[in-house]
Amino acid sequence: MGKRNLDETMNESAVSEIAEDVAALTTEKDEYQALCELVNPIAQPLANRKLAKKVYKLIKKAAAGEKTLREGIKDVQKELRKNEKGICILAGNVSPIDVYSHIPAICEEKEIPYVYIPSREQLGLAVGHRRPSILIFVKPSADFQELYDEVAETLHHLTVDAA
């Protein structure tokens, strides 16, 4: 097993395919409604289409930064145990639900805003890769502080209304 050259692993067609997938993050109104019908029963509060678009934008900016985004159950649980401040974003179409059903309770206990997004595939694309993601934790950063504050305030009101 020799080392691969960069030319072998990252050809231009693969990069353009990922760019097309990321560009497809915006969904039409009826597509979004169809995705919302596929979510599991515990997916509350579920982001509306406009809020989901802002959350995707926040995730893209956080993914570009360093150490501002955590992905996956283990990493997010570690951040929550450390009492880090941030926003928790969960995918709504995860099966079985038992995998991450305890996360909203932890977020409420630690007063961390959280929201469900209808599709784990789109959550993965927002991070910048093709693999689906079920759970993302975004920490505040000076690079995108204004957008972070806006989304956090909206999520805080969403969480209070749903309780």
From Swiss-Prot:
GO biological process, one term: rRNA pseudouridine synthesis
Signal peptide (UniProt feature, chain positions): none
Keyword line: Nucleus, Ribonucleoprotein, Ribosome biogenesis, RNA-binding, rRNA processing
InterPro entries registered for this protein in UniProt: eL8/uL1-like, H/ACA_rnp_Nhp2-like, Ribosomal_eL30-like_sf, Ribosomal_eL8-like_CS, Ribosomal_eL8/eL30/eS12/Gad45, Ribosomal_eL8/Nhp2
Major place of residence: nucleus
Similarity comment: Belongs to the eukaryotic ribosomal protein eL8 family.
Protein's UniProt name: Putative H/ACA ribonucleoprotein complex subunit 2-like protein
Organism of origin: Caenorhabditis briggsae
